[in-house]
Amino acid sequence: VPELAENFYKGRTREVGALTERAICTTLLIAGLLLPFYIVCGEDVGVFLYSNARSGAMIAACAFVLVPMSLTLISTSMLNSMGCEKHTLGIFLAGSGAMLLCTVLQPRYLGGGALLAGMACDSCITALLSLLLLRKKTGRLRIGKYCLRLLAAVLLCVALGLPAHAFCARYLSYFPAFTVTMLLLAAAEVLLFSLMRLIDVRTLLCRFFAKKSKKISVRS
């Protein structure tokens, strides 16, 4: 964010656009890595944390909200660094108004789910408006192809994870099934995200072992 603000106020449009795209793509990547876990293992998480499978089902059903929430957080930070505090306040009020309307009008149809629907509307509206404003400020936001590759990887992970989880749950007890499913999902994500050119496993491993070797040399 400090580097983005410096380039913005110096009028370096190309650098600002590149930094913005990199930040948004990184945010989407992190959210995309977490999504299959929550969708596939949401019920297990609910049982583990709250001893309630229904709460876990709600986690799985609302996992997609993680994407607009993440985008809102990073976009708001970047816009504020560009001096757009008034705009981000207006966007926040628009999203909050939509959430309030949902919580007032939807309980009769959705019950307690009205609050979740309101939060989803709030996140989607604020994320969309923030991205539109970022595009206007930076002059570029070319992330369409990246989003398609990320979506394909996430959907494939979920498609593989759901039957794997069902199989493990049928033949294993709760905790072993949960653990095995998580490991299978992690392996599927590494494979599919690499195939979609979303992550570079070799680079990540080199950085990891380089940091470890530096720590060992410092200690010695």
Feature annotation, model-predicted:
Residues 23-40, 109, 113-138, 150-154, ...:
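Short alpha-helical transmembrane segments in multi-pass integral membrane proteins
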Residues 35-40, 48, 61, 100, ...:
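Membrane-embedded alpha-helical segments of multi-pass transporters/permeases
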Residues 1-12, 17-24:
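Helix-loop junctions and terminal segments of transmembrane helices
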Residues 21, 38-69:
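Interfacial segments at transmembrane-helix termini and the short loops linking adjacent helices
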Residues 165-220:
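Membrane-proximal transmembrane or re-entrant/amphipathic helices at the cytosolic face
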Residues 64-94, 109:
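Membrane-interface junctions at transmembrane-helix termini in multi-pass inner-membrane proteins
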Residues 85-86, 93-128, 132, 136, ...:
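Membrane-interface helix-loop junctions in multi-pass transport and translocation proteins
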Residues 27, 59-62, 66, 92-93, ...:
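Residue-level recognition of transmembrane alpha-helices
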